[in-house]
Structures are given as C-alpha cells and as structure tokens.
Amino acid sequence: MFGKGGMGNLMKQAQMMQERMQKMQEEVAKMEVTGESGAGMVKITITGSHNVRRVTIDPSLLQDDDQEMLEDLIAAAFNDAVRRAEEQNKAKMAEITGGMQLPPGFKMPF
C-alpha cells in the first residue's frame, strides 16, 4: 500500500512537520504586531497570542473629553492588531504546509 519504505517516510515527514510547527509556535509567541486607528492616533501592540504589550494614545485625544470616540478608537486599533497577527500566523502556517489549504476552523494546538 505504501510501497518500499513508504510508511517510514510518511512518519519521518510527519515528525518534521511537527518540529516545524513547534518552531513556528515559538516564533509566534515572540512576534509583536501593532494595530492602528484614527490615522495612527491610537496604536496597540500585541503578541502573536493576542496579549497586549503596549497602548499608545495621542495626547490630543485625551483633551477632547469624548470618551466614546476614544473607546471606539481603542477597540478598532485592537481589532486591527488581531487581524494583522492572524495574517502573519496564516503566512507562517503556509510556509510550513507548503501552501496546502487547511480545513476551515482548523486550529493550531496553541
């Protein structure tokens, strides 16, 4: 069914992919991505695992006394950062899988 050495080859490939995925997980954990809103007036930097590292708010926004607008800008910056992190994760995953499309909803074990 697998041919001569086929099963051993398959197991070796699976082990190599597992090692590459572990390395990618380590890289993602170290990665930092910054999202912005309000033309850069609010910036949020997160890790690949979506932990917030830094929030930067332009001082002029603090003088406006418009809490709702500031809250919206913070939420938008966070969402932008998450989107960027997901794009980078997807690109790294494509490197490992050789561009092979994974099923929708497939989650990495991290």
From Swiss-Prot:
Pfam families: YbaB_DNA_bd. The keyword Cytoplasm applies. One of its GO terms (molecular function) is DNA binding. One of its GO terms (cellular component) is bacterial nucleoid. Gene3D superfamilies: Nucleoid-associated protein YbaB-like domain. InterPro entries: YbaB-like_sf, YbaB/EbfC. Keywords: Cytoplasm, DNA-binding. It is found in: Cytoplasm, Nucleoid. HAMAP family: DNA_YbaB_EbfC (MF_00274). Binds to DNA and alters its conformation. May be involved in regulation of gene expression, nucleoid organization and DNA protection. Homodimer. Belongs to the YbaB/EbfC family. This is Nucleoid-associated protein Tola_2216.
